């Protein structure tokens, strides 16, 4: 195959997010330079990833990214694989069309799958409007890549893909079209419309067939039990929606049979029949005893939903919750929270409760060594934290004044903290989206995480420490919250007084190599314990258990809130 710039180093996101987050053994046929495997390893470092690649220069680059890289002909039955357990995932990303006999090859290699293993493929659609347009004009271009790639040997449509999967003895879980430039497909069908009746073609069926450039296929040895996870989230805020809702559900949706939808506004509910297993995960619902709220809850019950409240802050901070009889927790089937202290506060109102600590979806690349003489960049990013940082601002400024050329500070959100700094090198970023917040953090070397010892703060999670550690920052933090997760002197430094904070900053300034050492140990901690993929089995098991116990949970719910039994 020809190698246009970057051809072998692309990551197909529609494949990446469908690799089961729990996969431990993956074989990728046509791995290119290993970009897909490298991206997945950032989410699941424990995976063993084997790549097969015929193009020697791409395979050479993949060796540094993957666990095993094989050359040779993937269609050769004698191709020797390393000793592996049954595969959790077998991937063909735009490969089957290049094989001489993809039917025989796939049928043989599908036997390598574990009982719950997954076949994942991306296959070009020869029914695409651009192909039909060329054929109608009597042309078949030969190109370096794309639908007319000169190395394609076989061609597939939606129907022939279905037949390919069935011929391997696999059960089709998903056939997802990849559609680009839908307006061009619609224009093509519009041009053909006068002839459709005579050809016996339905306009919508034709449009559905000619729009996809490719299809993404998921299939397995056995049917996947369905589970629909719908979520009503808050409006986007820095980290809150991503970490608590979007990222965990995206990881769960990588599991066969699990489908997820997230909305910050309205959500079209599934109809009551057929009764597909379904949960609604509702982030911080403000449930009151007014008729409108009760009617919404009745509607969810009538449509067969198991309702889960997602909560991650001290409810006492919002008096309306108690004023409404804690309906936020009592008016749902179950509650999920981020910390055990928060669980202890909420559990008296609803005993069906799970604790899912905050996690990081994907590990950023390791940090490069600090350059000699380079200033240390300290990160602070928070809202409404003046009471937490004010006791330490004089200590920070004194440390900076001792060697102002050795320090720089990046501040996100908190203008007051930025303005209180006495340091030439300081940068302020206003309230921003989560991606920007993480980008600013990634530029830094040290994370400053002060938290005063208050009830409200004790209910908070250690998310900021996880984020900073994932980026390889050295962490200096208050013992409130962070003392329960950081290992003092190993994954971070804890301070309870000004002298301790001063000593940490001075030592790191004098020995900046320790900054990277703390960062590396913190990153290893996140990789071991705090990645989103590691929570998937626990979350899926609990959600499926809630559905299986829905009748009993609904009975308990109606006992807690008998008003929900009344008609609208």
Pin down the residues of each PLM region.
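Conserved N-terminal segment of class I S-adenosyl-L-methionine
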Residues: 1-85, 89, 103-106, 137, ...
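S-adenosyl-L-methionine-dependent methyltransferase catalytic module, highlighting the catalytic core
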Residues: 9-10, 35, 100-223
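N-terminal pre-catalytic "stem/leader" segment of glycosyltransferase-like enzymes
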Residues: 223-289
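Conserved catalytic-core segment of nucleotide-activated headgroup transferases in glycan assembly
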Residues: 233-255, 362-363, 371-442
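Extended catalytic core of nucleotide-activated donor transferases of GT-like folds
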Residues: 261-345
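Nucleotide-sugar-dependent
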Residues: 317-318, 387, 434-440, 447-470, ...
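A charged, aromatic-enriched C-terminal amphipathic alpha-helix characteristic of glycosyltransferases
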Residues: 363, 513-552
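Conserved acidic donor-binding segment of nucleotide-sugar-dependent glycosyltransferases
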Residues: 486-499, 507-512
